[in-house]
Amino acid sequence: MKKLIITSMIVVTIALVALACGNKGATAVSNQQSNTGASGDIHFKAPEGWTTEKASSSMRVAQYKLPKAEGDKEDASLVLYYFGANQGGTSQANIDRWISQIQQPDGSDSKSKAKTENLTVNGLKVSTVDVTGTYTAEMAPGSGSFHNDNNYRLRAAVIETPKGNYYVKLAGPAGTVARWDQSYNDYLKSFEFK
């Protein structure tokens, strides 16, 4: 009986250690986030009101739900991606790809409607895009299934760091994204590389 209890305790201990190790990349309840790499740290702060979600892939550094605005049917989603040094493409290639994920109801070119900006945040070069229309991005890479969401807004940014680019993508109903405009701007301004 003693041997069975000791064996059970060992199994439970191993399971708890494995569970704890498996959550190394999990997001803390705190709004303060950091992603540590061999060449330094990227630090950022998620604004009040955003709901931290468990990242659904290893390329997602952080994932948030931004609660819907009154009148909208669903929440917006914001994901911070990191693919590694020299991975994920150039700033312009990503800006162009994001713009192509929004179609205009009148058939006009989304590129002419998109607002782009280049800025410097805490010494980091940041390229941004903001475009509204019908969201047609693929639901998951390689799935062959695509969104077809009218009156959506996509705000995205490429943050260039010494260890590689980070990619921020916010997509959701236009009213919901507008509700969170200031907190999104604050989020981008919070990025620091230490």
PLM regions with names:
Residues 46-104:
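Secretory pathway targeting signatures of secreted, lumenal, and periplasmic proteins
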Residues 95-159:
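Signature of long, low-cysteine stretches enriched in small and polar/charged residues
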Residues 50, 162-194:
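Surface-exposed amphipathic alpha-helical segments
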Residues 29-53:
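Post-signal peptide N-terminal segment of mature Sec-exported envelope proteins
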Residues 17-20:
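C-terminal motif of bacterial Sec signal peptides marking the signal peptidase cleavage site
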Residues 79-88, 115-116, 170-178:
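Second-shell loop/turn segments in exported
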Residues 22-24:
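Bacterial signal peptide processing site
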Residues 1-10:
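Bacterial N-terminal signal peptides that target proteins for export
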